[in-house]
């Protein structure tokens, strides 16, 4: 949806089920595997490697590199000045439209941040993934390799004090500032990774394909955030290249909502973003060469080399569309809406053959400046721009802004800030002097405004919790319910904020609302007693007490098993209010399944073992940590609803390695249950007597060769103390996942 939001398309009558005649940049040709990989031989095998996405060995900076510490040495004003200078210094190897790279940098930042999707928190600009495949070679990212190369001298100058992830996003913010727009703020703090991460962007095997992500009338499958393989949001020519602005509005609304944007934010981003720069479709896209990942080695990562004319400047081909939205493409103003409503529009084609709109009957001819000093042009718009006028909801919004441009300015500033920062988590993670005040979408939590509990208080509170009548299983499940809502992808959820007691989390089926209410009532009583009697203004938040209670239960269960462990506890969590909790936004954190609790939502069709791996990935735990957590939680009796599946012990509530010992016992033979779906029965191999029941969440630790190797370690006779210690460490990690203040 930004200034070059879709590359030229193939003959989509065969490749995308479209009748579009738009030109195409050829799709990569899949190469035969030699040799075949394990995933080729066994495509349904779970991918345990996804739990180790960014090993420290991959970083040239070393495991001890501290980005916030390095960033603190950065002169951000000097950095901004240098980025501004790059923006207005045109390079012969890729000349700047209108002498200004602002539009290109906005598109680069937008397309980095805009991959974010709310359903699973993946995507976004937080790790600099645009540098790597597939994003660096997506059809929607044509020519963004040039934008990053323009910034290389700046990155080279400031070195590790500024990450690529931050610089890519910051450049777009600087572009707006340089063209007269007052931005809402900016937060640094995105740390680079050093290799691509496998993300399911879609099942289609051709660029610009759509056939495997839709069902029904036009129901976009979860968790996808884009309508089309290789695009950030939607096809700017309309659905499947059919130039229908009303149908395009449906796609726009759906895809932007999946990035957590409402109608006003969506319209603000489109109108605001398209107030700058232009798109590029000067000629035949068949003359454009391969993307960076397929380009010849001598091009050094430069892709899409074009033989149309000079291949750059006035001859540039990026999207195949040739649109300049306003008479002032390097200056903020209300020109986009003034033109959108100031003319009637007729459907035309770009020089590259892509559908777009031009002012009707030659109106406005010559009023739009040429980027390189040529004759003036006629006003033009994308199909998706006309959607802002033809869709009744977008029309009401944009007509109001036409009359009140100051409202557009404010809406765009806030929506742009949200776009750039949506995947960064709480504002406590932001660095730099330009961070705006906390916003509702950042899931704000209050600052600590009281003295924290000390070691003596912690010991006393643990004793009260354990004497409260609540069971080990209840305390463990409650703490797990709070902390396991965290997801590493966009740093949302977790125990901090105490939102387990608020809507929507307190009503989630996975959290067993009736039992949860009972536990919280007891813990709130303990909290109130302590806070009303503690000396020196000490208090404990319910968020802290929930975690402390779970940790006390783990320590007790370990002691009951003959093992002394200490679960680290750091107070400092606070309790958020319902008013500062966006119920609709939090709803996407509700688990479809949680294999750690042996929970699955009714009707879920995906294999449980795959959902377990996905859950572990979002929690940021390694394969060994996932293994020890599942085994320990089963021993503690922490299953959803008190289910006995996977509770391979005669002493539930005691922290032991019984899960692994009994899972790997060859005296047990497993078979699928005839009485219950997704349940397996473990019977004595000799007598046939039923011993245990399990789900795939349990049996995967015996069937998958990698996980079995880990399970064997914890089933060894010398592993009992190690198991208890490893469980305590993994438990503490999950409890502290959202404690960015401890990093």
From Swiss-Prot:
| Posttranslational mods | Formation of the three residue Trp-Tyr-Met cross-link is important for the catalase, but not the peroxidase activity of the enzyme.
The EC number(s) this enzyme carries: 1.11.1.21
Q: Which reaction does it catalyse?
A: H2O2 + AH2 = A + 2 H2O; 2 H2O2 = O2 + 2 H2O
Q: Which CDD domains match?
A: catalase_peroxidase_2
- GO cellular component terms, semicolon-separated: cytosol
* Residues bound to heme b: 274
Biological process terms from the Gene Ontology for this record are: cellular response to hydrogen peroxide; hydrogen peroxide catabolic process
Query: Which InterPro entries does the entry mention?
Result: Catalase_peroxidase, Haem_peroxidase, Haem_peroxidase_sf, Peroxidases_AS, Peroxidases_heam-ligand_BS
Q: Offer an example of a GO molecular function term for this protein.
A: heme binding
Q: Where is this region: Disordered?
A: 1-40, 490-511
Q: Which cofactor does it need?
A: heme b
Transition state stabilizer, annotated site positions: 107
Covalent link (Tryptophyl-tyrosyl-methioninium (Tyr-Met) (with W-110)) residue numbers: 233-259
Biased composition annotated in UniProt, kind: Polar residues: 1-15
What the protein does comes down to: Bifunctional enzyme with both catalase and broad-spectrum peroxidase activity.
Outline the subunit composition.
Homodimer or homotetramer.
Q: Which family is this sequence assigned to?
A: Belongs to the peroxidase family. Peroxidase/catalase subfamily.
This chain's protein is named Catalase-peroxidase
Task: State the organism named in the record.
Answer: Mycobacterium marinum (strain ATCC BAA-535 / M)
Q: What is the lineage of its organism?
A: Bacteria, Bacillati, Actinomycetota, Actinomycetes, Mycobacteriales
